[in-house]
């Protein structure tokens, strides 16, 4: 039992460190779309306890005079960021323009907490035609912007048809 207690304590501390405030990838996303320093002006946190039934949930509130966005997963959190930018800050980020200078934008601080729950487990994106008429011509930078756009819109199931031909060959008669 004496050997078991330190092991348990180490596991508890390891698990506590797995719920980061301002996750690095979310901070990087904010700085990519809004310019350097945007991540310091919006507080974010992944909080799995927000979801009671496994659905993606985000909440928008305020903390220390800043917007505070929490999500039950990284996908929910980035969706919440997209919702906040669109519906609170009135910033429209589109496919063709996913970056803007937000240094001069004063982010509104919500007075009440807004909670949104996604009704769909899977948010599908793309179609088979996209592989031929647009994806083939994208650069690495354009791919990164597309992934950021998907994150801001809650996409968690982009079409990945690469290798599908092998599955069809092995499964279909």
Please give the residue ranges for each predicted region.
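Auxiliary, metal-adjacent structural segments of Zn-dependent hydrolase domains
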Residues: 31-53
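Short, surface-exposed beta-strand/loop micro-motifs that present aromatic residues
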Residues: 56-62
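Short, linear, compositionally biased motifs with a strong N-terminal bias
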Residues: 10-11, 173
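Sec-dependent signal peptide recognition
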Residues: 2-10
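Feature activates predominantly on carbohydrate-active enzymes
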Residues: 25, 29, 49-51, 63-173
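Bacterial Sec-dependent signal peptides at the C-terminal "C-region" and cleavage site
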Residues: 13-24
């Amino acid at each position: 039992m004496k050997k078991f207690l330190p092991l348990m304590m180490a596991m508890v501390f390891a698990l506590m460190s797995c719920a980061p405030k301002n996750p690095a990838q979310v901070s990087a996303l904010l700085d990519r779309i809004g310019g350097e320093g945007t991540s310091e002006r919006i507080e974010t946190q992944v909080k799995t306890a927000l979801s009671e039934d496994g659905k993606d949930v985000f909440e928008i509130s305020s903390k220390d005079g800043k917007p505070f966005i929490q999500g039950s997963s990284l996908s929910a959190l980035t969706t919440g960021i997209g919702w906040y930018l669109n519906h609170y800050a009135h910033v429209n980020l589109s496919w063709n323009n996913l970056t803007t200078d937000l240094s001069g934008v004063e982010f509104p601080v919500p007075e009440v907490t807004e909670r949104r729950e996604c009704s769909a487990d899977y948010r599908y994106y793309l179609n088979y035609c996209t592989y031929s008429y647009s994806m083939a011509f994208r650069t690495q930078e354009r791919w990164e912007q597309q992934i950021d756009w998907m994150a801001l819109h809650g996409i968690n199931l982009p079409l990945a048809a690469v290798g599908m031909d092998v599955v069809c060959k092995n499964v279909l008669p």
